[in-house]
């Protein structure tokens, strides 16, 4: 029957061991496990918050990129509009300059034509008088010559 007494002794030793473990060993282990659970839960919450923040930031960045693209397109459109305005201004200015140069050319040609026409009138009148003198055979005085030339020039 030593078996029973040994069994009871082992049972008592085991009960003391369990009581000792429950009093001194289990609380730190349970505390460590609970602390680890809290840190894992906090890490998961932080990861979820970071994922949400990353998604929000990504959406914000995409929105800012879209706005920047729209602003860039507006700037390009404005630059193209300004370029077209400048080209139109230059074209109008060039047309005005061209018209002015053509007008000056016509005025110069007209003035030259009148000058040459006047010279031609004077020469034709002089030739007519010279021809008339040869036909008549006598010289007309200078005053009469001048009157005749003026009348011929006026008629031409």
Curated annotation (Swiss-Prot):
SUPFAM superfamilies: F1F0 ATP synthase subunit B, membrane domain. It is found in: Cell inner membrane. Its main location: membrane. Keywords: ATP synthesis, Cell inner membrane, Cell membrane, CF(0), Hydrogen ion transport, Ion transport, Membrane, Transmembrane, Transmembrane helix, Transport. The chain crosses the membrane at residues 7-27. GO terms for molecular function: proton-transporting ATP synthase activity, rotational mechanism; proton-transporting ATPase activity, rotational mechanism. F-type ATPases have 2 components, F(1) - the catalytic core - and F(0) - the membrane proton channel. F(1) has five subunits: alpha(3), beta(3), gamma(1), delta(1), epsilon(1). F(0) has three main subunits: a(1), b(2) and c(10-14). The alpha and beta chains form an alternating ring which encloses part of the gamma chain. F(1) is attached to F(0) by a central stalk formed by the gamma and epsilon chains, while a peripheral stalk is formed by the delta and b chains. This is ATP synthase subunit b. The gene is atpF.
């Amino acid at each position: 029957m030593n078996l029973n007494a040994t069994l009871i002794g082992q049972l008592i030793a085991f009960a003391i061991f369990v009581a000792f473990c429950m009093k001194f060993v289990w609380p730190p282990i349970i505390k460590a496990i609970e602390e680890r659970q809290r840190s894992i839960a906090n890490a998961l919450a932080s990861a979820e918050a970071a994922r949400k923040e990353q998604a929000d930031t990504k959406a914000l960045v995409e929105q800012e990129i879209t706005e920047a693209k729209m602003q860039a397109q507006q700037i390009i459109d404005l630059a193209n509009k300004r370029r077209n305005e400048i080209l139109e201004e230059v074209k109008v200015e060039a047309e005005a300059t061209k018209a002015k140069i053509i007008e000056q050319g016509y005025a110069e040609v007209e003035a030259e034509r009148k000058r040459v026409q006047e010279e031609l009138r004077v020469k034709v009148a002089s030739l007519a008088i010279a021809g008339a003198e040869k036909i008549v055979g006598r010289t007309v005085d200078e005053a009469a010559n001048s009157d005749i030339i003026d009348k011929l020039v006026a008629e031409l």
